[in-house]
Amino acid sequence: MIVITLPDGSQREFPGPVTVAEVAASIGTGLAKAALGGRVDGKLVDTGHRIEGDARLAIVTDKDADGLDLIRHSTAHLLAYAVKELFPEAQVTIGPVIENGFYYDFSYKRPFTPEDLAAIEAKMTELAKKDEKVERRVLPRDEAVAYFKSIGEDYKAEIIAGIPAGQDVSLYREGRFEDLCRGPHVPSTGKLRHFKLMKVAGAYWRGDHRNEMLQRIYGTAWASKDELQQYLHMLEEAEKRDHRKLGRELDLFHLDEHAPGLVFWHPKGWTVWQQVEQYMRAVYRDNGYLEVKGPQILDQGLWEKTGHWDKYRENMFVTESEKRDYALKPMNCPGHILIYKQGIKSYRDLPLRYGEFGQCHRNEPTGGLHGIMRVRGFTQDDGHIFCTEEHILPECVAYTALLQKVYKDFGFNDIIYKVATRPEKRIGSDAVWDKAEHALMESLRASGCEFVVSPGDGAFYGPKIEYTLKDALGRQWQCGTMQVDFSLPERLDAVYVAESGERLFPVMLHRAIVGSLERFIGILIEQHAGALPAWLAPVQVMVLNITDGQADYAAEIAKTLQKQGVRAGVDLRNEKITYKIREHSMQKLPYILVVGDKEKAAGAVAVRARGNQDLGVMPLDAFSQRMASDIAHKV
């Protein structure tokens, strides 16, 4: 007898080997119909998987995260099937699941057009309606190579040829299409009903620019029509909020082919940058951080000591001068240790907190660049705390509270907390890791934060907390980090004198709140759809005159506000007032002040708030108080 234990602890007995589908059917016809796969002793498998002995089994349906992955993986194969039906000469390569969807790369003699994409999607729908069974078979490696060569799929043959000799490979067939795949997959194409193809892009074979440029078709797939529609609606909203589009429209920044991955900040955009930086500078000052500044170029020898030269060199920009090799720093930590090492440090000096708006450069591949969110040159609000093991808990508690306040001030209230614990390969004793992991978790508990643990995801040199924002569209952005480091101070021989007189290595806490300022400003632009709160807005107020008769008064109003520290402008153009109001409203200004003869005579202003709100006529002092309140309360 084979005993199958279900998630609720109940057990079912079978006289011999049994498939996942058969177990589901024994539970009920509804579950049998809904089953997409199963988890057998933790391993995700097809419904056709045979269970040969006692096992724990969870049936996977479209209500599970695993089920959604199965749907997306199988829809990628459905895409390839449709392409081969419509374009038999196309060669298939790879098609993985990605966040919110999937893609598949194809080699074809001409670019796919939008009309092709529509035809492919229609063919996918047609094939799904056939509800063709998805079947798995296993071949020896060499036989699989020969098979794919015989049907003209050279890329698949090349992939399989890279698998060790003597190893079997699995293939999945649906209808007339068969593909190399580890699986698992849904039991039939009829399970794939809610999908959409999104776009075509270029991608090099195996990610190598020396290889052929392939065509990558992206798609999304969901468990229900409602979920698909919600996702597509979110994408429409995201497109409206796209920081690249708003950056152009609001004249904040631009990107140029002469400097790929680097940002040209315009006056308005640089004003936003300055507001974020000055806010964070005050955070440093008010929380015991000493601001420092390190050089951008450091000698190869330092990067060899830190381990970056071996592990990270491909992502570093290197240069040479007078027969010495240097690198633009990809991070600020080594520089902070060199500052720490100047002079003897005592246990009385700890914790010692350094902060820097450090400009870093990383040689990101061109295909990975994205507006100001993913760049090659960026500035971090980078902080490092040198401390003892006993300081880890209180420092993390203080940091989490600080981070929560900062995020709230910028308009983010939904934060996800994750603790990444020790990996298999690590340095330091288990006792030290126990203490560090406990301190990180206790710091979150003390801050009233629910968190998830991600086992094994810590760095080799220490565990960390990741702080992820949720924006107005529900998207997640990992910004903040608190990383414990037992390694780098020792690598660079940074010590402190303990109370006993012994020289010890400090613990180093790497922390950032907003992370890359470029990326964070991009997130802010999208969070607020370009309508930044008054305290951040590059232009807070625009004063408009109705006729030339109020030009001097309008200019005087703007000058008075500027003296009060308000970022005010004045538009004295001889244009219709409705035209000027509409034009400045499109710039998403917090306030527009209109002055005509009545306002001039009364020493007042007519106030229009963002969103076409008419706040009426008020004395300038009253408006100034309102503006000051908005800035003080970060609205």
From Swiss-Prot:
It is found in: Cytoplasm. It catalyses: tRNA(Thr) + L-threonine + ATP = L-threonyl-tRNA(Thr) + AMP + diphosphate + H(+). Binds 1 zinc ion per subunit. InterPro entries: aa-tRNA-synt_IIb, aa-tRNA-synth_II, aa-tRNA-synth_II/BPL/LPL, Anticodon-bd, Anticodon-bd_dom_sf, Beta-grasp_dom_sf, TGS, TGS-like. Its main location: cytoplasm. The keyword Aminoacyl-tRNA synthetase applies. The keyword Protein biosynthesis applies. GO terms for molecular function: ATP binding; metal ion binding; threonine-tRNA ligase activity; tRNA binding. It is an enzyme of class 6 (ligase). Residues 1-61 form the TGS domain. Pfam families: HGTP_anticodon, TGS, tRNA-synt_2b, tRNA_SAD. It comes from the Bacteria. Its cofactor is Zn(2+). Gene3D superfamilies: 3.10.20.30, 3.30.54.20, Anticodon-binding domain, Bira Bifunctional Protein, Domain 2, Threonyl-trna Synthetase, Chain A, domain 2. GO terms for biological process: threonyl-tRNA aminoacylation. Coiled coil: none annotated. Its EC number is 6.1.1.3. Residues 242-533 are annotated as: Catalytic. Zn(2+) binds at C333, H384, H510. Homodimer. Catalyzes the attachment of threonine to tRNA(Thr) in a two-step reaction: L-threonine is first activated by ATP to form Thr-AMP and then transferred to the acceptor end of tRNA(Thr). Also edits incorrectly charged L-seryl-tRNA(Thr). Belongs to the class-II aminoacyl-tRNA synthetase family. This is Threonine--tRNA ligase.
